Amino acid sequence: MQDRRVLSGMRPTGQLHLGHYHGVLKNWLALQNEYDSYFFVADWHAFTTHYSDKIDLNTHVMEMVVDWLAVGINPNISTIFVQSKVPEHAELHLLLSMSTPLSWLERVPSYKDQQLKLNTKDLATYGFLGYPLLQSADILIYKAGLVPVGEDQVAHIELTREVARRFNYLYGREVNFEEKAEIAISKMGKKQAKSYRSLRKTYQETGDDEALIKAQALLQQQQNITLGDRERLSGYIEGVGKIILPEPESLLTKASKMPGLDGQKMSKSYGNTISLRDTAEQIQAKIKRMPTDPARIKLTDAGNPKKCPVWQLHKVYSNKSTCDWVVEGCTKAKMGCVECKQPIINAIEEVLTPIQGRIAKYQADPELIKQIIFEGSEKARSVAKETMIEVREAMGINY
C-alpha cells in the first residue's frame, strides 16, 4: 500500500491563488482518485521564512482547508491534516538530524536560491537550513512511496532518499540480521524462495535493476511472511539491512505555466496574483490594470501578442478560436487592449464563481472544518506513531 501512498503539502502563508489551483490543486484532484493521498497544511514550515512576521496562522490554516474542500479535495477519500497536529514529525526530524551531514543541507539548490530571492529577510537560521530535512521527515514518517513535485523540487526528494538510505544503513543492521533473513526466506516456500535467492544473487553480482524490481514484486505477493520479514528481505536484496524508512520516488507533475499579472510566474512574493477569493470586481480591476505590449500606444498601433502578459493568460484560458481572434486583432490593430482582456475576465469568473459558492458554504460551518482537520490529523498520527515505534526500536530508544 505504501508504494501507492502520495504525500503533499502547502505552507499557510497567505490566500491561495490561481497559480496554486493550476499548479498544485488540479494535480491533487487527479491523484486522490488513484492513490492513497495524504495532503497536509505545513504550518511549521511557514516559520522557516515568516518567523518574524505577525501572520494569523489560525485563520490561514482554516481558510486553506476550506479552499481545498471547495476545489474538490474530498476528505472521504483523502487524508487532510495539519502538520503541527502530528508532533511525531518533529521527533523524526530531530532524530534524522543526528545523522544527516551538514553539507547535504547546504548543497540543496533552494537553500541559496531562496536566500537570494528573499534577501530582505534574515534567513541565516537553523530552521531555514534544516527545512529540507523537516520535509524529509514529513515524507518518511508516512512511508510515502510517491511525492508529486515539479522539476525544481526533485533535489528535495533526492535528499530524502539519501537520508532514508543512510538511516537504514546505520540502524537497519539488527542483531542476527542475516539469520533472521534466512528464516524469513524459508517461510516463502521452496519455489518462491529459490526465485528470491536467484534474483538477489543476480542483483548483487550484476546490479541488474530488473532483478531488483522482480524481487521486490515477489515479496509483495507473499502471504506467509510478516511485514517485518518483508522489509527485512527487501533490505537483504540490496545488502543494506532492514528497510525501516523506504525511499520515496518523485512523481513529476506537469509544471504550471500560470503567469501572474505582470507576466512573471504567479506568486505572492511578486504581488501579481488573483486569489481564489477575489470578487468579480477585484478580478476585473486587476486584469484591466495589466500591462500590454508597449508598442501599442494608440488603438491604431499594431502589437505583438508574444510581448504582452495578457497573451500568456489567453494561452491558459482561451480556446483556439479566441486565441486566433486575439492574434488577428492585435497584430492588425483591429481591437483595443480592453476588448482583448474581456474573455480572460469572463473565463476566470467562470472558474471561480462555483468555487467561491462552495467556499461560502464551508466558511459558514467552521465546526465541520475543525472536525475534518481533527479526523484527518488523528488518522495521520496513527500512521506516524507506527513508524516512530519502528524508528525508536531500530535506534535502541524504545525503553
What is the meaning of each model-derived region?
Residues 2-7, 12-137, 158, 162-164, ...:
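N-terminal Rossmann-like or analogous alpha/beta NTP/dinucleotide-binding catalytic cores
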Residues 18, 155, 161-399:
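Conserved nucleotide- and phosphate/pyrophosphate-binding catalytic cores
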Residues 57, 126, 149, 153, ...:
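Aromatic-acidic/polar surface patches that form glycan- and anion
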Residues 78-80, 143, 248-250:
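A short coil-to-beta-strand element that immediately follows conserved catalytic motifs
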Residues 82, 150, 277:
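Active-site-adjacent beta-strand anchor residues
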Residues 115-121, 143-154, 272-274:
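Flexible, glycine/proline-enriched loop segments at strand-loop-helix junctions
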